[in-house]
Amino acid sequence: MDIKLKDFEGPLDLLLHLVSKYQMDIYDVPITEVIEQYLAYVSTLQAMRLEVTGEYMVMASQLMLIKSRKLLPKVAEVTDLGDDLEQDLLSQIEEYRKFKLLGEHLEAKHQERAQYYSKAPTELIYEDAELVHDKTTIDLFLAFSNILAKKKEEFAQNHTTILRDEYKIEDMMIIVKESLIGRDQLRLQDLFKEAQNVQEIITLFLATLELIKTQELILVQEESFGDIYLMEKKEESQVPQS
């Protein structure tokens, strides 16, 4: 199963998405939390053996530098340098946000003008799997990044050696669907509770993506940073009440 990530136009686009989840002024956002989420996202792509372009890795290096500076003892010169790097990054994100808003405005105008002209039908091309720039799908990926990081830590603390099995996406799709039998929804993190190793977790996640792609499952998230639920596709789906 090929997965092609077309979610973000670059590292600043990813950072802007992470920052916007806080629903506050960019300069008030807890930058350390944003850095952790960015690094977890990139780490997850690498764990899934997906291509991570150089610009994302360069940004990851810059973020790790900012993070390390913030962890150092409060020495005046170091603190000033760390603050400069942080402010520089936030300024870049704010500038990118303005350009993106302008681009969206121009695109809307372009689409409006396009209504006055006839054009040939667009040929639809279907790929094996494509994660479109959909907020909930991106949040699914970010939530999975956190789950994977926690499970890796759990496996490391247990010090247990488990023989590696060959996991198939088709088999895991059945497991995911069976997990929903007799219930209206399933919290994403609960899906991975019994997983025994990283490969099993990743294959389960790929199976979940495939079920979403084939519209057998839908995602529900009530609010930013809230739990993500998996639900079977029905005509009317209710958001789980907490």
UniProtKB/Swiss-Prot annotation:
Assembly and oligomerization: Component of a cohesin-like complex composed of ScpA, ScpB and the Smc homodimer, in which ScpA and ScpB bind to the head domain of Smc. The presence of the three proteins is required for the association of the complex with DNA.
Origin: domain of life: Bacteria
Gene: scpA
Subcellular location: Cytoplasm
Keywords: Cell cycle, Cell division, Chromosome partition, Cytoplasm
NCBIfam families linked to this entry: PRK00104.1-2
GO terms under biological process: cell division; chromosome segregation; DNA replication
The protein's name in its UniProt record: Segregation and condensation protein A
Functional note: Participates in chromosomal partition during cell division. May act via the formation of a condensin-like complex containing Smc and ScpB that pull DNA away from mid-cell into both cell halves.
